[in-house]
UniProtKB/Swiss-Prot annotation:
PROSITE patterns: ACYLTRANSF_C_1, ACYLTRANSF_C_2. The modification N6-acetyllysine is found at K261, K268. It is an enzyme of class 2 (transferase). Gene3D superfamilies: Chloramphenicol acetyltransferase-like domain (3.30.559.10), Choline/Carnitine o-acyltransferase, domain 2 (3.30.559.70). It comes from Mus musculus (Mouse). Its main location: endoplasmic reticulum. The gene is Crat. Changing M564A: Lowers activity towards short-chain fatty acids. This is Carnitine O-acetyltransferase. Its EC number is 2.3.1.137, 2.3.1.7. CoA binds at K419, K423, S424, E425, K426, L427, S428, P429, D430, S456, R504, Q555. GO terms for molecular function: acyl-CoA oxidase activity; carnitine O-acetyltransferase activity; carnitine O-octanoyltransferase activity.
Length: 626
């Protein structure tokens, strides 16, 4: 069970005005308290939607068997009704009946490494510096931009986001700074110091696998300027010219149980414990990377994506990370930059809103040179490495190397059109892209598959995500019709429009809390909590097929010309993320090399062809002008 690619369909914030210095106390709480609570959908409604979603992905025999199980489950006075009542009681007692369960199930109890399997990476536009000065100047400006965004969070002046005219829960913005995941033997935890009595005033900077604590506020509480931060980054760079022989950070890339053991080992030592505490408490991390290995232009972006997602291995930049840290910004010597974030705290949109703000901020000219004041030397974080820890580091290096070699990742910039074309056809760009994904997959494999697209539940207090299931009866009818020469072109157009509209309708239901995936998960977890034997519908082949997402997808729109990416959630699947810009679309496609049936470049090729064929179909049969 993976971080379920929980990434969402939300309008980006746009550039926020430089933050007001006036603190608006209580505004955040008042806004949050006014949000509706997440409803528990009616049982029969969810089960009907479940049966409908199974039709394109399971055989007729399997479907008929599941229909029987569903009927038994929802008999009057039966187990389904009992579990539903339990969920409804839970919903009355809690601020959000799902959020705590979801955090545990999707993230904290997930035992695979966070690297590749859970934490998304982001590629930002390549910067035009090519030397150390440029790298440090840009990093300093980026840090100043994040602190500017942070002041809006601190002062509660962050503009509220809206979706379909409804205000959204802003809680995730309060989770992404000064927070960190902590490994545990069976379940991890997340620590957050933003609201502590003495909130942290430092960030972590990593260079040559060495960690530094850099104070970014003066004693009077004002933030350092980018000029002042630049001077501090130079000091860090000059005091870490050689790579650390023991890249402690690489331990965070391991399987969670393995890392939990190594972590307990590591923090037995007081010096190590203090260093780890400093990293966990820091506002965020900045990784000053070596340049990405030189490769031809067409694969350069794929290499950069790897650097952002996993660091490229122990010979490159993987030791320059603390993967448990919620936010890590990465700036390399050659101008490539981006970030990786730990997924437990938030979905993509709050991260992208921060990125949009920061990238816009980095373009602002320095109007005044700030006065040079004497600043203390940034503190180097020391680690005492025992033979046992050294051995743990070696094992982590080997495991990471295997994971990296298995990842097949491809960046695609689709130049032919952007969201402008579907909009001109009065079609939702997101739904249009999702139907193209269905067409691409069907053309390769000759069948539909369980497809996950993340839907935001942020209309509700503490809402995270639910699932939009893109493989539908209507999408299957379209992709079959598209390959059938006996189907008239005009009918193909109608099938396409119907498939896009069906996806749009599912999306609208999902963001209103009426999708069935989280509801079924809730019923399953309620059964575990009530210690009743697991109902048959959850032990059924159809349920296993429905939860095996061969396509795990997400739209993460941004104003910045960037794209997010993540690994597939199943061994024989794809991870696909996209940012539809006005006249082009940024895609990322990932697969695993260990699966002979999947190939990221092939999927990207078929996706491009599907989008072009759908455009041609619509252009050849224009809608009648009303």
């Amino acid at each position: 069970m993976l971080a379920f690619a929980a990434r969402t369909v939300v309008k980006p914030l746009g550039l926020l005005k430089p933050s007001s210095l006036m603190k608006v106390s209580g505004r955040f709480k008042a806004h949050q308290d006014a949000l509706p609570r997440l409803p528990v959908p009616p049982l029969q409604q969810s089960l009907d939607y479940y049966l409908k979603a199974l039709q394109p992905i399971v055989s007729e025999e399997e479907w008929a068997h599941t229909k029987q199980l569903v009927d038994e489950f929802q008999t009057s006075g039966g187990v389904g009704e009992r579990l539903q009542k339990g969920l409804e009681r839970r919903a009355k007692k809690m601020e959000n009946w799902l959020s705590e369960w979801w955090l545990k199930t999707a993230y904290l109890q997930f035992r695979q490494p966070v690297v590749i399997y859970s934490s998304p990476g982001v590629i930002l536009p390549k910067q035009d510096f090519v030397d150390l000065q440029g790298q440090l100047r840009f990093a300093a400006k980026l840090i100043e931009g994040v602190l500017d965004f942070k002041s809006m969070i601190d002062n509660e002046t962050l503009p509220v986001e809206f979706l379909g005219g409804q205000p959204l829960c802003m809680n995730q913005y309060y989770q992404i700074l000064s927070s960190c995941r902590v490994p545990g033997p069976k379940q991890d935890s997340v620590v957050n110091f933003l609201k502590s009595k003495r909130p942290p005033t430092h960030i972590t900077v990593v260079h040559n696998y060495q960690f530094f604590e850099l104070d970014v506020y003066h004693s009077d509480g004002t933030p350092l300027t980018s000029d002042q931060i630049f001077v501090q980054l130079e000091k860090i760079w000059n005091s870490s010219l050689q790579s650390n022989k023991e890249p402690v950070g690489i331990l965070t890339s391991n399987h969670r149980n393995t890392w939990a053991k190594a972590y307990n080992n590591l923090i037995k030592d007081k010096v190590n414990r203090e260093s780890v505490n400093s990293i966990q408490k820091s506002i965020f991390t900045v990784c000053l990377d070596k340049q990405v290995p030189r490769v031809s232009d067409d694969v350069y972006r794929n290499h950069v994506a790897g650097q952002m997602l996993h660091g490229g291995g122990s010979k490159f930049n993987s030791g320059n990370r603390w993967f448990d840290k919620t936010l890590q910004f990465i700036v390399a010597e050659d101008g490539s930059c981006g970030m990786v974030y730990e997924h437990a705290a938030a979905e993509g949109p709050p991260i992208v809103a921060l990125v949009d703000h920061v990238m816009e901020y980095t373009k602002k000219p320095e109007l005044v040179r700030s006065p040079m004041v004497p600043l203390p030397m940034p503190k180097k974080l020391r680690f005492n490495i025992t033979p046992e820890i050294k051995n743990d580091i070696e094992k982590a290096k080997q495991n990471l190397s295997i994971m990296i070699q298995d990842l097949d990742i491809m960046m695609l910039t689709f130049h032919h059109f952007g969201k402008d074309f579907p909009k001109s056809e009065k079609l939702s760009p997101d739904a249009f892209i999702q139907v193209a994904l269905q067409l691409a997959y069907y053309r390769i494999y000759g069948q539909a598959c369980a497809t996950y697209e993340s839907a935001s539940l942020r209309m509700f207090h503490l809402g995270r995500t639910d699932t939009i299931r893109s493989a539908s009866i209507d999408s299957l009818a379209f992709v079959k019709g598209m390959g059938d020469s006996t189907v008239p072109e005009q009918q193909k157009v109608e099938l396409l429009r119907k498939a896009v509209q069906a996806h749009r309708a599912y999306t609208d239901r999902a963001i209103r809390g009426e999708a069935f995936d989280r509801h079924l998960l809730g019923l399953k977890l309620q059964a575990i909590e009530d210690l009743v034997s697991m109902p048959d519908i959850f032990m059924d082949t159809s349920y296993a097929i429905a939860m095996h997402f061969n396509l795990s997808t997400s739209q993460v729109p941004a104003k910045t010309d960037c794209v997010m990416f993540f690994g597939p959630v199943v061994p024989d699947g794809y991870g696909i993320c996209y940012n539809p810009m006005e006249a082009h679309i940024n895609f990322s496609v990932s697969a695993y090399n260990s699966c002979a049936e999947t190939n990221a470049a092939r999927m990207a090729h078929y996706l491009e062809k599907a989008l072009l064929d759908m455009r041609t179909l619509l252009q050849n049969h224009p809608r009648a002008k009303l």
